[in-house]
A protein has these predicted regions:
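Bacterial N-terminal signal peptides that target proteins for export
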Residues: 1-3
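N-terminal signal peptide c-region/cleavage motif recognized by signal peptidases
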Residues: 11-14
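N-terminal (or domain-start) structured segment
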Residues: 17-103, 141, 167-195, 287-288, ...
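Hinge/capping helix and adjacent helix->loop/strand transition within the periplasmic-binding protein
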Residues: 44-48, 68-79, 91-183, 244-277
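A ligand-binding cleft/hinge motif common to bilobed small-molecule-binding domains
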Residues: 85-96, 155, 159-166, 194-227, ...
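Periplasmic-binding protein-like
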Residues: 109-116, 216-251
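An extracytoplasmic/periplasmic, membrane-proximal ligand-sensing/linker region
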Residues: 255-315
């Protein structure tokens, strides 16, 4: 049972209510980080009148919290729930049973761990185009290592790149899922795979040591601090794949309540304090709130469903 939270008032609204952030996992993970950091800044920036309570609700990879919010908190304007790319991937792949992404409202993302395509320092591939051309010529010649299982978010990144290049036989793209990004990059540095697909935070140390080269970062713009790494987009491949950090809210709240949360998140994203938090934790700027984020999530879900069907993850 969720703990009761103290009542408080969101600045700029007329009704006092409790603010609770549900982290759908145990302490220490990305969702816990989102709740704690965003919750802290909501209070520090005086966007709420009392500290935000963080409730941990681990289970089913986020599915337990999702089901609870849908079933028991559908009209509650007092709750925000931490989410990420893993949440939308699991929804698209029916990992939460019959749950669908339209059972909640996606209120905002305010930071992201950028997706990357990486090769060892001595790889013959000098840019993303070289790699794409090699896969088109011989799909079996390039194997990607990634820290998620087949069909997971890391697997999707090279598939999105290949689809954007007009390659339709994506089931022929080789992917080896290993136990996390560290194992994936070790496989590539060791020559066991030709490339690694993962997140920027997983490879920063290897970039600094010179063991790897990043062929592309899968963001809308180059990442601050890594301005020498080109985006996939500027190389002709229209792919943005980031492990965003954000929040959803119950489906049944009013538009005014939804927009109020979007405004609060935008204020957090714009703050110097949040920029410091991102820099200290390896996150890149990625801000989408309100209807903009909702529409973006809808597109991501549809694309993930399509790719997942094509590779047989879902029927």
């Amino acid at each position: 049972m969720l703990a009761t939270t103290a009542a408080l008032m969101l600045a700029g609204t007329t009704s006092a209510f409790a603010t609770e952030c549900i982290a759908p996992a145990n302490a220490g993970g990305g969702w816990d980080f989102t709740c704690r950091q965003v919750g802290k800044l909501l209070y520090d920036l005086k966007l709420v009148d009392a500290p935000v309570q963080v409730t941990k609700m681990a289970g089913a990879g986020g599915g337990l919290a999702y089901a609870h919010v849908v079933a028991d908190m559908n009209t509650d304007p007092d709750v925000i729930v931490a989410a990420s790319s893993a949440t939308t991937t699991r929804l698209a792949q029916k990992a939460f049973g019959d749950a669908t992404a339209d059972q909640v409202r996606w209120v905002g993302a305010i930071g992201a761990d950028p997706g990357v395509i990486v090769v060892a320092k001595d790889s013959p591939f000098q840019n993303l185009g070289d790699m794409v051309a090699a896969i088109k010529a011989d799909p079996g010649s390039v194997a990607f290592a990634g820290g998620s299982a087949a069909g997971g978010f890391d697997h999707m990144k090279p598939l999105q790149v290949m689809k954007s290049a007009g390659f339709t036989e994506i089931t022929k793209v080789k992917y080896i899922g290993v136990d996390g990004g560290a194992d994936a990059i070790t496989q590539t540095i060791g020559g066991h795979t030709q490339a690694m697909t993962g997140d920027m935070s997983e490879i920063v140390g290897f970039i600094k040591s010179g063991d790897v080269r990043v062929l592309a970062v899968l963001t809308e713009a180059r990442v601050p601090g890594f301005e020498d790494i080109p985006t996939a987009r500027e190389q002709g491949f229209d792919v943005v794949a980031v492990n965003w950090r954000g929040l959803y809210v119950p489906k049944g709240i009013s538009d005014d309540q939804f927009n109020a949360w979007a405004t609060k998140l935008q204020a957090v994203a714009d703050s110097a304090e949040w920029k410091e938090t991102m820099a200290a934790n390896g996150l890149a700027p990625f801000t989408k709130v309100g209807a903009d984020f909702q529409g973006w999530v809808d597109g991501v879900i549809a694309e993930t469903e399509t790719l997942s069907r094509e590779i047989g993850v879902i029927q």
